[in-house]
């Protein structure tokens, strides 16, 4: 679904483990890594889209995860001009995303990147919470920073809100 401003409705999914690490996945046949995400179909709620994408992209079902929280509002990013398909109608200039933070309840062996036969990802790993903000493609970085900051109190209740604050040296 593309809105009147040209943004496609989309859900983003951050899966965390009990150690506060997040699942980071490599796009199939590419060198870019990202969180699972996907479009919201006509008549589908964001939560329904999230569970559909969760299975399609990483093979997890609702019983494998627990929803911890979701973003208060939709977050947007614009696509670089080279990625905009001018021949499609309506033209999609970017994504508006509702993000979900999920806790993996099952064993990680439930993760199956080939669950649907047309994999979106070809590898995955657990990374530290703030790692994706520095590593994602530049046009998604601002959204990732906002999402991670909003989710930090839930995902990392006993750690500092920003990783770099704890690394700063003392002033003399």
From Swiss-Prot:
<dbReference type="InterPro" id="IPR020476">
    <property type="entry name" value="Nudix_hydrolase"/>
</dbReference>
<keyword id="KW-0378">Hydrolase</keyword>
<comment type="similarity">
    <text>Belongs to the Nudix hydrolase family. RppH subfamily.</text>
</comment>
<dbReference type="InterPro" id="IPR015797">
    <property type="entry name" value="NUDIX_hydrolase-like_dom_sf"/>
</dbReference>
<dbReference type="Pfam" id="PF00293">
    <property type="entry name" value="NUDIX"/>
</dbReference>
<dbReference type="GO" id="GO:0006402">
    <property type="term" value="P:mRNA catabolic process"/>
</dbReference>
<dbReference type="InterPro" id="IPR000086">
    <property type="entry name" value="NUDIX_hydrolase_dom"/>
</dbReference>
<comment type="function">
    <text>Accelerates the degradation of transcripts by removing pyrophosphate from the 5'-end of triphosphorylated RNA, leading to a more labile monophosphorylated state that can stimulate subsequent ribonuclease cleavage.</text>
</comment>
<dbReference type="GO" id="GO:0034353">
    <property type="term" value="F:mRNA 5'-diphosphatase activity"/>
</dbReference>
<feature type="domain" description="Nudix hydrolase">
    <location>
        <begin position="6"/>
        <end position="149"/>
    </location>
</feature>
<protein>
    <recommendedName>
        <fullName>RNA pyrophosphohydrolase</fullName>
        <ecNumber>3.6.1.-</ecNumber>
    </recommendedName>
</protein>
<dbReference type="InterPro" id="IPR022927">
    <property type="entry name" value="RppH"/>
</dbReference>
<feature type="short sequence motif" description="Nudix box">
    <location>
        <begin position="38"/>
        <end position="59"/>
    </location>
</feature>
<dbReference type="GO" id="GO:0005737">
    <property type="term" value="C:cytoplasm"/>
</dbReference>
<dbReference type="InterPro" id="IPR020084">
    <property type="entry name" value="NUDIX_hydrolase_CS"/>
</dbReference>
């Amino acid at each position: 679904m593309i809105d009147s401003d040209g943004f496609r409705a989309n859900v983003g999914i951050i899966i965390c483990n009990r150690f506060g690490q997040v699942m980071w996945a490599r796009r199939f046949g590419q060198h870019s890594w990202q969180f699972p995400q996907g479009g919201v179909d006509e008549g589908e709620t964001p939560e329904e889209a999230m569970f559909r994408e969760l299975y399609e992209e990483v093979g997890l079902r609702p019983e494998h995860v627990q929803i911890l929280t979701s973003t208060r509002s939709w977050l947007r990013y614009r696509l670089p001009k080279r990625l905009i398909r001018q021949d499609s109608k309506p033209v999609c200039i970017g994504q508006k995303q509702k993000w979900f933070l999920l806790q993996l309840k099952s064993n990680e062996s439930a993760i199956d990147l080939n669950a649907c036969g047309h994999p979106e990802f070809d590898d995955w790993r657990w990374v530290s919470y703030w790692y994706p903000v520095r590593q994602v493609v530049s046009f998604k970085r601002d959204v990732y920073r906002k999402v991670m900051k909003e989710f930090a109190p839930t995902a990392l209740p006993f750690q500092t809100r920003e990783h770099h604050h704890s690394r700063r040296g003392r002033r003399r």
